[in-house]
Amino acid sequence: MTKKIVAIWAQDEEGVIGKENRLPWHLPAELQHFKETTLNHAILMGRVTFDGMGRRLLPKRETLILTRNPEEKIDGVATFQDVQSVLDWYQAQEKNLYIIGGKQIFQAFEPYLDEVIVTHIHARVEGDTYFPEELDLSLFETVSSKFYAKDEKNPYDFTIQYRKRKEV
């Protein structure tokens, strides 16, 4: 297996990715996809995103936090203060690294991304955090996508799009 750095996120039609440091929707099928994709790999997020998840660890995933606070110590979590230290850690690994947010973390890792996995929620929801416009998705070509219709458990239609970085 060739390891890779992948950004994975969900957004609504306006680019909303969060509200009050949480996901502003509940889509069990999308959460299941996230789980299956990231299982047995490493996930990286900012400390604010980790706080928004209630500081709970996701099972069978190595959790990495990027924080400005060098004193931040969290049981079961590897903490880093800068992008380069995360990249140095990654070089010694055999697993994928999934960048799961928030906005500043996506921006910081854009130059290093091999792939992106975007869930496009076909609705507009209320939110206060938007996916960074600075991240240039034109650098990535769509390789596949899968549509999910809303149902009794998932209140919105959504499409999961898989993109890989274009060859230069």
UniProtKB/Swiss-Prot annotation:
Q: What is the effect of changing K60Q?
A: In strain: 30, 56 and 1/1
Instruction: Show the Gene3D superfamilies listed in the entry.
Output: Dihydrofolate Reductase, subunit A
Q: Where does substrate bind?
A: I8, W9, A10, E30, R61, T119
Residues holding NADP(+): 9-10, 17-22, 46-49, 66-69, 83, 100-105
The consequence of E14D is: In strain: 21
Which EC class does it fall in?
Answer: oxidoreductase
Q: What is the effect of changing I100L?
A: In strain: 21, 30, 56 and 1/1
Swiss-Prot/TrEMBL keywords? Antibiotic resistance, NADP, One-carbon metabolism, Oxidoreductase, Trimethoprim resistance
InterPro entries in UniProt: DHFR, DHFR-like_dom_sf, DHFR_CS, DHFR_dom
User: Is NADP set as a keyword in this record?
Assistant: yes
User: Which residue range or ranges hold the DHFR domain?
Assistant: 4-165
As its record notes, the protein acts as a catalyst of: (6S)-5,6,7,8-tetrahydrofolate + NADP(+) = 7,8-dihydrofolate + NADPH + H(+)
**E.C. designation(s):** 1.5.1.3
Listed result of changing P70S: In strain: 21, 56 and 1/1
> Could you tell me one molecular function GO term of this UniProt entry?
NADP binding
Q: In which pathway does it act?
A: Cofactor biosynthesis; tetrahydrofolate biosynthesis; 5,6,7,8-tetrahydrofolate from 7,8-dihydrofolate: step 1/1
Query: SUPFAM superfamilies in the record, alphabetically?
Result: Dihydrofolate reductase-like
User: How the protein is affected by changing E20D?
Assistant: In strain: 21, 30 and 1/1
Q: What is the role of this chain? A: Key enzyme in folate metabolism. Catalyzes an essential reaction for de novo glycine and purine synthesis, and for DNA precursor synthesis.
Instruction: Give the similarity note.
Output: Belongs to the dihydrofolate reductase family.
Q: What else is on record for this protein?
A: Strains 1/1, 21, 30, 56 and 92 are trimethoprim resistant.
User: What protein am I looking at?
Assistant: Dihydrofolate reductase
Report the source organism: Streptococcus pneumoniae serotype 4 (strain ATCC BAA-334 / TIGR4)
